[in-house]
Amino acid sequence: MYVKSIILEGFKSYAQRTEVNGFDPLFNAITGLNGSGKSNILDSICFLLGISNLSQVRASNLQDLVYKNGQAGITKASVSITFDNSDKKQSPLGFEAHDEITVTRQVVIGGRNKYLINGVNANNTRVQDLFCSVGLNVNNPHFLIMQGRITKVLNMKPPEILSMIEEAAGTRMYEYKKIAAQKTIEKKEAKLKEIKTILEEEITPTIQKLKEERSSYLEYQKVMREIEHLSRLYIAYQFLRAEDTKERSAGELKEMQDKIVNLQEVLSENEKKIKALNCEIEELERRKDKETGGKLKSLEDACAEAQRVNTKSQSAFDLKKKNLASEETKRKELQNSMAEDSKALAAKEKEVKKITDGLHGLQEASNKDAEALAAAQQHFNAVSAGLSSNEDGAEATLAGQMIACKNDISKAQTEAKQAQMKLKHAQQELKSKQAEVKKMDSGYKKDQDAFEAVKKAKEKLETEMKKLNYEENKEEKLLEKHRQLSRDINNLKGKHEALLAKFPNLQFAYKDPEKNWNRNSVKGLVASLINVKDNSTATALEVVAGERLYNVVVDTEVTAKKLLEKGELKRRYTIIPLNKISARCIAPETLRVAQNLVGPDNVHVALSLVDYKPELQKGMEFVFGTTFVCNNMDNAKKVAFDKRIMTRTVTLGGDVFDPHGTLSGGARSQAASILTKFQEVKDVQDELRTKENELRALEEELAGLKNVAEKYRQLKQQWEMKTEEGDLLQTKLQQSSYHKQQEELDALKKTIEESEETLKSTKEIQKKAEEKYEALENKMKNAEAEREKELKDAQKKLDCAKTKADASSKKMKEKQQEVEAITLELEELKREHASNEQQLDAVNEAIKAYEGQIEKMAAEVAKNKESVNKAQDELMKQKQIITAQDNIIKDKCAEVAKHNLQNNESQLKIKELDHSISKHKREADDAAAKVSKMLSDYDWINAEKHLFGQPNSAYDFKTNNPKEAGQRLQKLQEVKEKLGRNVNLRAMNVLTEAEERYNDLMKKKRIVENDKSKILATIEDLDQKKNQALNIAWQKVNKDFGSIFSTLLPGANAMLAPPEGQTVLDGLEFKVALGNTWKENLTELSGGQRSLVALSLILSMLLFKPAPIYILDEVDAALDLSHTQNIGQMLRTHFTHSQFIVVSLKEGMFNNANVLFKTKFVDGVSTVARFTQSQAGKIPKEAKSRGKEPN
C-alpha cells in the first residue's frame, strides 16, 4: 500500500484545491526554498493519519490548520489521500477487496472534524485501526522521521528505543488491545465489588438477622414451656407457706403479750428511783445558788463592763488609724495628681510658647505682606502718574535712570583700576617674600614635622579612647548609684519585715524536705498568688475564699506529702495539689441567666475578679469558681434564690446569700481587708526584687568596667602629655621668624584673591549697567508701549500683594484665637495646681493631728486591756469553786440518766413488741386471704393439694428448690417480655427467600470471576508470544543496525543491548565501537557520528517488517555531502519494499529520487512542480497547484 495522490483544500498555505499526483511507488523527494510550503505536504499526511500531538505539525489547535485561521473566508480544511492497495499482502485488515483506498479528513472552524473512508463516514477508532494494522501508527510514528527526529532518537531512553522495536514487531496494537482488556477487567472488578457490597451490606446481614430471629422464636417457645412448669411449682410452694404462716402466728402472739407485761413492771420501779434522785439534785442546786450565785454574777458584770470599755477604746483607736491611713492615701493621690499636673503644665507652657512663636512669625509675615501691599499700591500710583521703577524699586524717570547707569559704569571702571593696581603690587611682594622664605634655615621644618607627629599621636590616642566607649567619671557615677541602691534595698527589707510582722498569717516558711529540692513546685499561699483587679471587690473576695485564702498551692500530691512530713511547717496548713484538686466552675449559661436577671455590670463570677498565672487555673477555680459577686444585697438575693441559678452569692460589702439555707452579714470591721494589706506587701516585694536585680546588673557592669577605666586613665594621661608637648611646639613655631614670614605670605595670597574677585565683580557690574543703559535707551524710543506694559505689571503685582496680605491676615487671626484658647487652658491648669497645693497642706495638718491623737489613745487601750485581764482572772477562780459543786450534782444526774436510759430501752422494746404483734396479726390475716384467693384463682390446687411437698412428685420441694424456681421464674418472665417485643413470627419464611437470593448472586459472582481468570490466562499466553516476537525483532534489527552503521561509517560497529542488570523487556540502549574500542556512551562521538547512529537504527527498522510508507523530513541536515549521497544511494538500491517520501535541500539526497516535487513562490502564489528523474537529467512534467503565500 502506497500513496498515489494527495488533494489539499484550505489546508495551511494551500487555499484552493490542490492536487499532487504521480507519486512514485518507491522513492519520492520534495524540495524547495524555506517557507515555500514543502513541509505542509508532510503535515497534511500526518493530519490525515490522525496525529493527536498537533505540535508535530506546527499547530496549537485544529483551527490553526485552516488557511489563515479562517479569516480569509475559508472556514474548512480538507485533506484526501488515495492509497494504492493492489498488493494484498500489505492490505489493511478488512480492505482486501479494494484496489484503492481513499481516506479524507475535514476540519471546520467552530465545528467538529470528520473522517471518510471511500466516501463513507468513519469514526476515529476505525481510521486508527486501519493505519495501525499496516504499521502506520501516527501517534507513535517510527515511519515518520521529521525534522529533529534524529536528535530525538539519540535522546531516547531505553524504554523508548524498545517501543520502536515493538512497533516494528507489530506488538504495539496488542498492547493497546491488552490495555483495553484490562480496563474491561477493571469494570468487571467494579461489578464484582458491587455484588460483594450487596452481599456484605444487604443480604448477609439480612440472613444473619433472620437466623437470629428464628433462634429468638424457638427460644421464646422454649421459655413459655418452662414458665408454665415453674409457675405451678412456685404457686404450690407459696400456698403451703401461707397455710403455715396462718397456723404459726397464733402461738407467737401469746408469747409477745407476756413480755410486754414484765417490761411495764420494770418501768414503774425505775420511775420511783428517778423521782427520789431529782429531789436530792434540786436541794443541792438551791444550796449552790445561795452560796455562789450573787458573787459570780457581780464578777461576770464587772468583766463584761471592762470588755465593753476596752472594745470601745480599741474601736476608737482603730478608727483613728484608719482615718490616718485614709489621709495618707489621700496625700499620696494628691502628690501623684500634682506631679501629673506639673507635667501637663510644663507641656502646656511649651505648647503656648510654640504657638506664640508661630503667631509672631505670622505677624511678621502679615506685616511684610502689608508693607508689600503698600509698596505695590505706591508703585501702581507712580506708574499711573508716568514714573517708572528702577531695580531698587524706587520710582524715577527713564532719563534719571539712564544717568544713574552712567554713574554705575564710571564707578565700576574706577574700582577695577584700583583693584588692578593693588593686585600688581601684591604679586610683586609675594614673589620677593617667597624668595626670602626659601633662604630660611630648615629648623622650622624640623619643628613642623615634630608638631605633626605629636598631633597624629594625639589623634591615635583619642581614637583608642573612643573605642573603649568609656565616659569620663562613669565609674564614680556607678559607684555612687551602687551605694544608693544598697541603701534603698536595706530600707525596703526593713519595711518588708515590718509588714510581715504585722500580718503573721501571710507568712509561709518551710525547710526543703530533700536535697536539690525544686522550690518552683511550691507556689505559695492563695492570697499571695492573686492580684485583685478592683480594690472595691477585695472584701467580697476575702469572704468568698474564707480560710482557703491561707491554703498552700503545690504542683502535685507528692510535693504536698513531702512538705507535711519533712517541711518543718510552723503551724497547720491545708494544701491544694493542682494535679489532684477537683474544681468546679459556674457554667456560662448560668452566668448569662444571672446577667440577664440583674444586668451584666452588677454580677460577676468571683474568679473573673482576680488575676493569676494560667498554671494555677484549677486551684483558683477551687477557691473562687463557685460563687457570684453582686454589687448590692437586692441583686445578690435575686441571683442566689433564682430557681435557675441557686448559687452562693456575696455582695461587695461581704454579705453572703446561700440558697442552701444560710444568710450572713451585718457590720464588718472597718480595717482594711487582708487582700488589700497583702497587696502592700507584694508591692514592697516587687520593688525590692527590682532593686536587687538592678544592683546585680550594676555590680556586673562595675566588674566589667574596672579594666576599661584603668586603660582609659592610662590613655588619658598619655594624651595630656602629648597635648602639653604639642602646645610647646606650637608656641615655638608661632614665635619663629619663618612663621611670621609665612603669615605675611598668606596675607598677600589673600589680598591677591580678593583683588581678583573685585576685578571679576566690577566687570560684571559694568556689563549689567551697560546692558541696562541700552535697555533704557530702547524704552525711551518705545515710551508709550512700555508705560502700558508697566501699568499692567503694576496692577498684577498689586492684586497679588493684596491676596497674599489678606491670606496672611486671616492666618494670623486664626492663630491668635488658638493662642487665646490654649492660654485659657494654661490658666485653668495653674488654678487647679494651686487648689491641689491647698488641699495637700490641709491633709498634712490632718495627718499631724491624727498622729498625736493615736499616740494618746494607745496608752489608754493598753490600760483597758490590763483591766480586762484582771477581771477575767477573778471570774475564773470563782468558776472553779462552782465546778467542784457541779461535780456532785453531775454524779446524781448520771444516776438519773442511767435509770432514764433503762426506761427508754424498756419503752423501745415494748414498742417493738407492739409492732411485732401488729405485724403477726397482719401476716395471719394476709396468709388467710392469700390461701382463699389462691384456691379461687387456681382450680388445680384442690385437686393436687395432697401432692404438695411429697417426694418423687411434680411438687417435690427437695428435688426442685422453690426459691430458686421463683428466681428462675422471674428471670424467665423478663426474657419472655424482652423476646415478646422483638420476636418475628415470619422469620422462617423470609429466611428461605433471602437464602435463595444469596445463592443466585454467588452464582453470578463465580461466573464473572471465571471470565476474569480466562482473560488473564489469555493475556499471559499472548504476553509470552509477544515476548518471543519481540526477541526475534530485536535480533533482526540489531543485526541490520550493525550492518548499516558499518556501511555508512566503515570500520565502525554498533548494536542495541539491554542496560546493565536488566533484560530486553526493560529497554534497549546504543553501544558503538570505533575500530576495536567500544564507547561508554554517545557523548564520546562527534555530532555527525551520532546522527549516523540514529539514522542507522531508523533504517534498520525499515528492513524489519517494513511499513508501506516512510516519510523523511530533512534527516540529512546535520550530515556532510558525502554521507548524504551515500544515504540517497542506499535508499535507492537497498530499500525497494516501501514507498519513501523525502524532504531534503541537498542534491546528494534528492538526485537519487525517481520523482521530485519542487515547491516555489511565483508573484506571491505557491506552486508545486513534478519532475521525473533519470541519469540524463530532470524533465519537468507538470505544475499542479497555485496558492497564496503562507501566513
Curated annotation (Swiss-Prot):
CDD domains: ABC_SMC2_euk. The modification N6-acetyllysine is found at K114, K222, K677, K1158, K1160. Keywords: Acetylation, ATP-binding, Cell cycle, Cell division, Chromosome, Coiled coil, Cytoplasm, DNA condensation, Mitosis, Nucleotide-binding, Nucleus. InterPro entries: P-loop_NTPase (IPR027417), RecF/RecN/SMC_N (IPR003395), SMC (IPR024704), Smc2_ABC (IPR027120), SMC_hinge (IPR010935), SMC_hinge_sf (IPR036277). It is found in: Nucleus; Cytoplasm; Chromosome. The keyword Coiled coil applies. Central component of the condensin complex, a complex required for conversion of interphase chromatin into mitotic-like condense chromosomes. The condensin complex probably introduces positive supercoils into relaxed DNA in the presence of type I topoisomerases and converts nicked DNA into positive knotted forms in the presence of type II topoisomerases. The SMC hinge domain, which separates the large intramolecular coiled coil regions, allows the heterodimerization with SMC4, forming a V-shaped heterodimer. This is Structural maintenance of chromosomes protein 2.
